[in-house]
Amino acid sequence: MDYEALKEQWGEVEDRDGVRLSWNVFPSTRMEASRLVVPIGALYTPLKEKPDTPLLQFDPVSCKQPCRSVLNPYCQVDVRARLWICPFCLSRNPLPPHYKDITANAIPPELHPSNTTIEYRLSRPAPAPPIFLYVVDTCQEEDSLAALKESLIMSLSLLPEHALVGLITYGTMAQVHEIGYTECPKSYVFRGNKEYAAKQVQEMLGLVQPAMRPGMPMQQPGRPFPAGPASRFLLPVSQAEFQLTKAIEQLQKDPWPVAGNLRALRCTGVALSVAVGLLETSFQNAGGRIMLFAGGPATEGPGMVVGPELREPIRSHHDIDRDNIKYYKKALKFYDNLAKRTAHNGHTIDIFAGCLDQVGLLEMKGLCNSTGGHMILTDSFTSSMFKQSFVRIFEKDADDNLLMGFNAVLEVLTTKELKVTGLIGHAVSLNKKSTSVGETECGIGNTCTWKMCGIDPSSSYGIYFEIANQGGPSQNMQSPQKGMMQFLTYYQHSSGHFHLRVTTIARNLSGPAGDPAIAQSFDQEAAAVLMSRIAVFKAEVDDGPDVLRWVDRMLIRLCARFADYRKDDPSSFRLEKNFTLYPQFMFHLRRSQFLQVFNNSPDETAFYRHVLNHEDVSNSLIMIQPTLDSYTFDQEGGVPVLLDSTSIQPTHILLLDTFFHILIFHGETIAEWRKAGYQDQEGYENFAALLEQPKEDARDLITDRFPLPRFIVCDQGGSQARFLLSKLNPSTTHTSGAGAYGGVGAQSAQTIFTDDVSLQTFMEHLMKLAVSGTN
């Protein structure tokens, strides 16, 4: 099967099951697996929107304990004996009585070969409606606060009627608004410079009640939620909308005076720990989101990231490298503990930063990364980037249910040939051991079950596996054996019930050693994304240069293993079609903002890495290797061009998409004509149309992008052109003279002033090292 046909097949599997695998044939021995270099991994998007996924209105048929795998198309069914055989533990299970009428031609939907992904609406209802708790920073300029208030009031109309909603505001103090009290505005005030234990918060808010003691039966689910003490602070939208709108409208800038040489006092840490304490008491394991809107860094109390004096700058990457960090370790520990508590309770924390300065995302990143929350970094709450990204969180499906899932848990089962080594993505381990758990660890390992809390249709997780068998495949098998994995995602649907999405994947095991089927089954795009997740995971704990060396070493080893070459002859080096782009992806990953922190603040690095760990293969590839399209007079529409400095031409317009930025770049001549106003003159309609075309294409790119990218229009030689130049392969630098691609293009291409090596030089070194056999 040729590469294009295989790619199409993998695309169909991704559309159907939300899964891309690095290897689509599994090696049959551990020895063979170790020679693959790139681990066996799956990038899985559990809630991938798929209109034709059947929603079954009954509980699934499961295998007996401890296996608990779910009936799926790969199960053998004995219709006469009314039995099914589990492919994971090989035990025989009786079919339930209501399946008595099945025949070889009339099978239930979960056994249908095309239903490898299926969703069940479980009979278990959610313990409470979804909860939304807004935590709002009032130390902001008037215009920013006014824009934020407008967005918050508008968002109330996007929430389901029965959802519970509450408000905490903070500045020098933190205030919990009692929206259930209608006589006058009433709030409980917490000191901003004091650390409150969970118990203190609960006592001060009067939340301690006997009904919610551990071990007591939970109240029967249903509407409306019973009026416990927490209902003074969290009320259904239908009841609280008027009170809450009034409370938000009346929000004023924090009254605490701020001297000219000081930052405003902000107790972000106290506000968050009060929010966590409020939900923890009454709503443990009920789906809820704490949404933090931060207009600046925490400057007092637990979790402070910078002192109040303006002459003391907030930490940079350089400070962290030199260990010149006064507050970092303490703040990180505080927020990480808060993240653990929140994840344990099944709640999600979103952070919206609306500030030109850093707000402390580096310290707070665990709050989002452990709970599946969103992280959105903008310059101000007045920006369309914030407003539109915020609205997109509340997108709904055809039945008017929010597209977000709450309180989610992912379990992975494997057949005996495979073991799961870990997960990289926004989740925490539930420390559940099973026969599916491997000996080694990659990412969050030593478990087969993870808790994600917040999950949405684009949440994607990198799951890594190892091969368990020491010996080879059994020689007497007629048909190839299959290795299998099953993903079980339990989550609270916003309609009020728990759902279970089941995806079952089976792939052939390779034949005897040296089976060419393994190399042909390599999906270079999925592999690049799975490897970049490992690199970013390593970058969080290791030194930058060490991670780059690891990326290089793995690439050299992969090429040495799978390329065709004569030893010590770089000119003979050839890669198969499904490997040719992989070195290029690694070249751009090495230069990307995920691994190179130069020119980015620590907050930006935390934000970029957070988004990479949330997206699927195609979006992650855009982040690693941005797309570049060129527009000029003698062609129809945009044409994809090389991400290379030779693509900059005076009479061309370029459209760059890095996922985080969408940039329109006018070549020198085009910019001069535009400044001269030719597009407004008669007879130059084609020039006006040329200027419009990239804008229209950019609009299409923005429509379903989350978070909303920053939109930049710039000219060759302008200061904003740096966004493009930093992403291009520098094949024409001040040292290289004419371009490496040669020809006319290179003569008129822009020179890039950089000491970075070009892709061509990188490939030359790679070939030399791969064929030398010393790796």
Curated annotation (Swiss-Prot):
Keyword RNA-binding appears in the UniProt entry: no
Family annotation (Pfam families): Gelsolin, Sec23_BS, Sec23_helical, Sec23_trunk, zf-Sec23_Sec24
Keywords linked to the UniProt accession: Cytoplasm, Cytoplasmic vesicle, Endoplasmic reticulum, ER-Golgi transport, Golgi apparatus, Membrane, Metal-binding, Protein transport, Transport, Zinc
Keyword Endoplasmic reticulum included in the entry's annotation: yes
Annotated residues for binding of Zn(2+): 63, 67, 86, 89
GO biological process: COPII-coated vesicle cargo loading; intracellular protein transport
Domain of life: Eukaryota
Membrane-protein topology: Peripheral membrane protein
Primary location: cytoplasm
A GO-annotated cellular component: Golgi membrane
Subcellular location: Cytoplasm; Cytoplasmic vesicle, COPII-coated vesicle membrane; Endoplasmic reticulum membrane; Golgi apparatus membrane
GO molecular-function terms, A-Z: GTPase activator activity; zinc ion binding
Main function: Component of the coat protein complex II (COPII) which promotes the formation of transport vesicles from the endoplasmic reticulum (ER). The coat has two main functions, the physical deformation of the endoplasmic reticulum membrane into vesicles and the selection of cargo molecules.
Subunit relationships: The COPII coat is composed of at least 5 proteins: the sec23/24 complex, the sec13/31 complex, and the protein vtr-7/sar1.
Similarity comment: family membership: Belongs to the SEC23/SEC24 family. SEC23 subfamily.
Entry protein name: Protein transport protein sec23
Species this protein is from: Neurospora crassa (strain ATCC 24698 / 74-OR23-1A / CBS 708.71 / DSM 1257 / FGSC 987)
Lineage, uppermost ranks: Eukaryota, Fungi, Dikarya, Ascomycota, Pezizomycotina
Gene label: sec23-1
